[in-house]
């Protein structure tokens, strides 16, 4: 998907809280919004080049969103709103092989006590719930999730297990917002309970997908499946 707004390059200075950062744009210090509540400490380092997307809301306090950053020469998209859009585009373009038969694609549907990113149905009304997680934590080509403990993430996985037990389809897709990576694993050091839940889900028949993305300064799109090591 192409970014539908003006994109500017800036230099990252600091991040006083989860939602805001200071950058240098056109030789001036500017406060911008960070659409990612994760830590991103290994990405957002003082002096790195970042991409800003012009906001569409008039008179907002932060005129730009910080959506991506260069880690060395590698561009990483950190916008937490992007993964669902990229996955929806991939579903409609039949790029996720196991899910190509699901033509009815609905966003943000509730089952039990959780709201899932997608509810899919095929022509025979078989139902499949899909949860999406954006991944930005990378080291030497290997990626992990989460970068901070996530009770909500574990809850989603346990709900997916229950959906599978009821005879419906269930899956979780880790969308890696980076290009050149070769492996995905749960981040047991940061959140061992999430990793335990993910391994249990695999055992119970929940589908686990991991895909990297083509990331440029103009667009981001789902690219290839990545090896999953649980």
UniProtKB/Swiss-Prot annotation:
Signal sequence range: none
InterPro entries: SfsA, SfsA_C, SfsA_N
Gene3D superfamilies registered for this protein in UniProt: 2.40.50.580, 3.40.1350.60
GO molecular function: DNA binding
CDD domains from the UniProt entry: SfsA-like_bacterial
Pfam families: SfsA, SfsA_N
Domain of life according to the entry: Bacteria
The family this protein is said to belong to: Belongs to the SfsA family.
PANTHER family, alphabetized: SUGAR FERMENTATION STIMULATION PROTEIN A (PTHR30545:SF2)
Protein name in the entry: Sugar fermentation stimulation protein homolog
Organism whose genome encodes this protein: Clostridium perfringens (strain 13 / Type A)
Gene of this entry: sfsA
